[in-house]
Amino acid sequence: MELVSVAALAENRVIGRDGELPWPSIPADKKQYRSRIADDPVVLGRTTFESMRDDLPGSAQIVMSRSERSFSVDTAHRAASVEEAVDIAASLDAETAYVIGGAAIYALFQPHLDRMVLSRVPGEYEGDTYYPEWDAAEWELDAETDHEGFTLQEWVRSASSR
């Protein structure tokens, strides 16, 4: 199964401020993001899950949480570790699971990712949440497409670092 991180980030790696995106909404980015993850399970932190309850993404939500809890959503599953999240996604017969944040979840999964799909928003923004740094030697830029308001980059972990 492939683990893929999906995020929108500014040039300074900012992904959020006070729980919101720090830049104006980019409808084309939101559309491609929702379309990409619609039919597959997503892995996200509890806070991110709670913030999206009115419009949950993905076919299932694997919510990372250290505390024992259940969710009042049939498609939500709790996981306490990367391994447990991967096992849950595999039990759902997923070929791909998308890691969609927040910052601590991105950092936790970074060493385990196969791909990153990053919407690069031009400019630097003030924020309190950042996408983790990655070792450029371990990644290859596979595709880059310019869109209005963002550039979509697809990164693949290099074969030598797997």
Swiss-Prot record:
Keywords noted in UniProt: NADP, One-carbon metabolism, Oxidoreductase
The protein's enzyme class: oxidoreductase
EC number per UniProt: 1.5.1.3
Pfam families: DHFR_1 (PF00186)
GO cellular component: cytosol
Pathway it works in: Cofactor biosynthesis; tetrahydrofolate biosynthesis; 5,6,7,8-tetrahydrofolate from 7,8-dihydrofolate: step 1/1
Activity: how regulated: Activity unstable at KCl and NaCl concentrations lower than 2 M and activity increases with increasing concentrations of KCl or NaCl.
Chain positions recorded as substrate binding sites: D29
InterPro entries assigned: DHFR, DHFR-like_dom_sf, DHFR_CS, DHFR_dom
Catalytic activity: (6S)-5,6,7,8-tetrahydrofolate + NADP(+) = 7,8-dihydrofolate + NADPH + H(+)
PROSITE patterns registered for this protein in UniProt: DHFR_1 (PS00075), DHFR_2 (PS51330)
Residues at which NADP(+) binds: 8, 14-20, 47-48, 67-68, 101-108
Function: Key enzyme in folate metabolism. Catalyzes an essential reaction for de novo glycine and purine synthesis, and for DNA precursor synthesis.
PANTHER family: DIHYDROFOLATE REDUCTASE (PTHR48069:SF3)
Family according to the record: Belongs to the dihydrofolate reductase family.
Name this protein carries in UniProt: Dihydrofolate reductase HdrA
Highest classification ranks of the organism: Archaea, Methanobacteriati, Methanobacteriota, Stenosarchaea group, Halobacteria
Gene expressing this chain: hdrA
